[in-house]
């Protein structure tokens, strides 16, 4: 009888040990996958050729057939639609903030914002949801291209700023035609904003 009890106890211990091992393995794999999701934008950005990437090729192909409003940043391989509306527009591209304050055709301050980092369920989804992840890699002199209402506008970056989250002045109308791009810092929405200011090329 005691042998049978010992055998049952040993089997129970064996099952518990097996289950704990499976749980530990799943937790380790989950942690590794989480690191992959978090690191995807950073890892892939190391391989961007600023002179020859998907965006630079697309700009050349679409020059004579502009069909939608888009933002292109060749240096960091950004190719995004933009639209007015609310924050939900950033799920599919960039958000045109304060349209009444400016646009490429009429001048003023044309302001676009997009997510810096949003984790998706897959590496591809994380990359798609985090278009401005590499906005900090832009420098003065870099080119930004805007397609607006069937016309292509070329801008050059003249300034970079870091501002507080409540710095609403970055969206105010300007006397000169200006493009303003901004996104949260990697520290999050409460940490601040990285701002890019560009002027229209003549």
Question: Predicted segment positions?
Answer:
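N-terminal Lys/Arg-rich, disordered targeting/topogenic segments
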Residues: 1-19
């Amino acid at each position: 009888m005691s042998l049978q009890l010992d055998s049952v106890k040993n089997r129970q211990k064996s099952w518990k040990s097996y289950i704990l091992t499976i749980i530990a393995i799943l937790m380790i794999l989950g942690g590794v996958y989480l690191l992959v999701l978090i690191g995807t934008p950073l890892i892939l950005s190391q391989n961007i050729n600023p002179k020859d990437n998907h965006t630079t090729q697309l700009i050349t192909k679409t020059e004579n057939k502009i069909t939608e409003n888009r933002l292109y940043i060749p240096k960091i391989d950004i190719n995004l639609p933009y639209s007015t509306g609310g924050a939900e527009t950033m799920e599919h591209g960039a958000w045109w903030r304060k349209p009444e304050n400016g646009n490429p055709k009429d001048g003023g301050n044309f302001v676009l914002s997009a997510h810096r980092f949003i984790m998706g369920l897959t590496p591809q989804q994380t990359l798609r949801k985090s278009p401005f992840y590499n906005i900090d890699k832009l420098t003065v002199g870099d080119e930004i291209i805007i397609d607006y209402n069937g016309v292509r506008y070329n801008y050059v970056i003249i300034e970079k700023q870091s501002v507080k989250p409540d710095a609403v002045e970055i969206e105010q109308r300007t006397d000169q035609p200006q493009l303003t791009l901004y996104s949260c810092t990697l520290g999050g929405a409460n940490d601040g904003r990285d701002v890019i200011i560009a002027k229209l090329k003549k």
